[in-house]
């Protein structure tokens, strides 16, 4: 647990509540003090959904601290069962309320004696894991609970469907373009002649979970959420899984070939090579674009990539392998899974950055001065400050990255969206000069605050005025070189004279 100005992955209870609110007719109750209960507001603001967020906060206040939580938590569970009639109620503490060290499992047992709904306590260590790890574990816990329940009741469907079928695991609320990706994956499966058995947790009910073993295989499109569930189903039912993210032309083809191998091992006798060839040549514009003059203009340009494991690794490979862009460094904030990330991006970038500190990321961007950034909402802010364009490719994200229109990142339509994102993220040709001539920049003033909080330099008004006269496409570089020169010389205030001295010294 730490106090942070910005977090890439939220605390564990956010992951648990993302899973609970993704299912249909499941209610989440968080045992939390005021301040930890922002999930409802965040989801209501960001997700383009008509329904209210099915989450209730059982507030830890002074009365609870004096008397204990049992009465309040149990009453809230029973009240929500009566009001909402959910199939399942998931109780989760937050990292703050976990400090109380209360026996919440006992509260759940007490409440379940008086409820029609099943009641589960999220089996998550709130001190040790983040949002993504908690979401992965909570999904596995719910699946395991209902598989075991169906097995006891004799309603578990274990016989495979007559034709090839798939479970798509890991599509959640507040996921990066998850709903668009899900639609694209369903279309891809239909094109391959594969029936979608279940999509979980998004839009599924807990009663559907007993049908999970009927699918021929599981597809886990995201590294972060769904892996534990797929491993559980493989252990219990020998159900194979495909864990290749179909993002970009090469990886989409690799994913389809892996699916082909899984199906043929079960006697399906399918061959998808003609489909891959046709999609790559005629449907996806990415392969054609990568050979066009527009893409050749990007060859050798420098870029940096930062995000979760899934999107940062896939984007690094697309930029380097499919578009010839030089990835100076690629990074992830998923420190718990760093070895997988290093192996994935090996050979596709010069350096690897593993951190969840946004100031380290910002300083790394400023150090290499790339032509474009591909990252999260935070890297977008960094890009604004450094006058470097940024394409957002991973959560955490703000409202503009929950588009109403169709914007998948996976599959063959996803490759087209990625081409547009990459191409439009670079400042091209005369664009910057035209913006200088005709206006259109967000601001004419140079933001002179450093990226790190401990910036020790100030610019005089005359120095800033002189800096503003420099064309925009090199202004950022001149500014950084001047500040570097000033630090080396022990100068704390940058004047016009310092600017010119730096220019002579470093050729800025």
From Swiss-Prot:
Reaction(s) this enzyme catalyzes, per UniProt: chlorophyllide a + oxidized 2[4Fe-4S]-[ferredoxin] + 2 ADP + 2 phosphate = protochlorophyllide a + reduced 2[4Fe-4S]-[ferredoxin] + 2 ATP + 2 H2O
CDD domains with a match to the protein in the record: Pchlide_reductase_B
InterPro entries the UniProt entry points to: ChlB/BchB/BchZ, LI-POR_suB-like_C, Nase/OxRdtase_comp1, P-CP_red_C, Protochl_reductB, Protochlorophyllide_Rdtase
Binding site for substrate: 429-430
Alphabetical GO biological process terms: light-independent chlorophyll biosynthetic process; photosynthesis, dark reaction
Signal peptide: none
Cofactor(s) in the UniProt record: [4Fe-4S] cluster
Binding site for [4Fe-4S] cluster: 36
E.C. number(s) listed in UniProt: 1.3.7.7
Pathways per UniProt: Porphyrin-containing compound metabolism; chlorophyll biosynthesis (light-independent)
Residues of the active site: 294
HAMAP family the UniProt entry points to: ChlB_BchB
Purpose of the protein: Component of the dark-operative protochlorophyllide reductase (DPOR) that uses Mg-ATP and reduced ferredoxin to reduce ring D of protochlorophyllide (Pchlide) to form chlorophyllide a (Chlide). This reaction is light-independent. The NB-protein (ChlN-ChlB) is the catalytic component of the complex.
Quaternary structure annotation from Swiss-Prot or TrEMBL: Protochlorophyllide reductase is composed of three subunits; ChlL, ChlN and ChlB. Forms a heterotetramer of two ChlB and two ChlN subunits.
Family of the protein in this entry: Belongs to the ChlB/BchB/BchZ family.
Protein name (database record): Light-independent protochlorophyllide reductase subunit B
């Amino acid at each position: 647990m730490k106090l942070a100005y910005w977090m890439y992955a939220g605390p564990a209870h956010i992951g648990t509540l993302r899973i609970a609110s993704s299912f249909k007719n499941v209610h989440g109750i968080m045992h939390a003090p005021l301040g930890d209960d922002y999930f409802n507001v965040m989801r209501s603001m960001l997700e383009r959904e008509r329904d209210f967020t099915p989450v209730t906060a059982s507030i830890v206040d002074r009365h609870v601290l004096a008397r204990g939580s049992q009465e309040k938590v149990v009453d809230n569970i029973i009240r929500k069962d009566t009001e909402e009639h959910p199939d399942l109620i998931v109780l989760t503490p937050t990292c703050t309320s976990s400090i109380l060290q209360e026996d919440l499992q006992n509260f759940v047992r007490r409440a379940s004696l008086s409820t029609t709904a099943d009641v589960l306590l999220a089996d998550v260590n709130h001190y040790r894991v983040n949002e993504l790890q908690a979401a992965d574990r909570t999904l596995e816990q719910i699946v395991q609970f209902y598989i075991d329940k169906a097995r006891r009741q004799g309603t578990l469907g274990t016989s495979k469907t007559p034709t090839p079928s798939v479970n798509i695991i890991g599509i959640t609320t507040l996921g990066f373009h998850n709903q668009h990706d899900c639609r694209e994956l369903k279309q891809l499966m239909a094109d391959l002649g594969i029936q979608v058995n279940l999509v979980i947790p998004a839009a599924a009910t807990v009663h559907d979970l007993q049908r999970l073993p009927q699918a021929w295989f599981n597809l886990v499109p995201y590294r972060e959420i769904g892996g534990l569930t797929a491993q559980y189903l493989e252990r219990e039912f020998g159900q194979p899984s495909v864990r290749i993210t179909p993002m970009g032309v090469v990886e989409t083809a690799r994913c389809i070939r892996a699916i082909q191998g899984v199906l043929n091992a079960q006697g399906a006798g399918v061959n998808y090579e003609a489909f891959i060839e046709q999609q790559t040549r005629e449907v996806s514009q990415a392969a054609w674009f990568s050979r066009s003059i527009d893409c050749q203009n990007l060859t050798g340009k420098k870029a940096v990539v930062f995000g979760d494991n899934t999107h940062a690794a896939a984007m690094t490979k697309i930029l380097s392998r499919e578009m010839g862009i030089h990835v100076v460094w690629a990074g992830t904030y998923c420190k718990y899974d760093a070895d997988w990330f290093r192996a994935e991006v090996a050979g596709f970038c010069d350096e690897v950055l593993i951190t969840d500190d946004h100031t380290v990321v910002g300083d790394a961007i400023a150090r290499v001065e790339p032509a474009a950034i591909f990252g999260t909402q935070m890297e977008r802010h960094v890009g604004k400050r450094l006058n470097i364009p940024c394409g957002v490719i991973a959560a955490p994200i703000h409202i503009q990255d929950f588009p109403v229109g169709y914007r998948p990142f996976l599959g063959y339509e996803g490759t087209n969206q990625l081409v547009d994102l990459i191409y439009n993220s670079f400042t091209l040709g005369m664009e910057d000069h035209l913006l200088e001539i005709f206006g259109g920049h967000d601001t004419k003033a140079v933001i002179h605050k450093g990226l790190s909080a401990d910036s020790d330099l100030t610019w005089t008004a005359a120095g800033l005025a002189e800096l503003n006269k420099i064309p925009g496409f090199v202004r950022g570089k001149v500014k950084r070189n001047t500040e570097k020169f000033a630090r080396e010389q022990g100068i704390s205030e940058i004047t016009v004279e310092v600017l010119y001295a730096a220019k002579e010294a470093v050729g800025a």
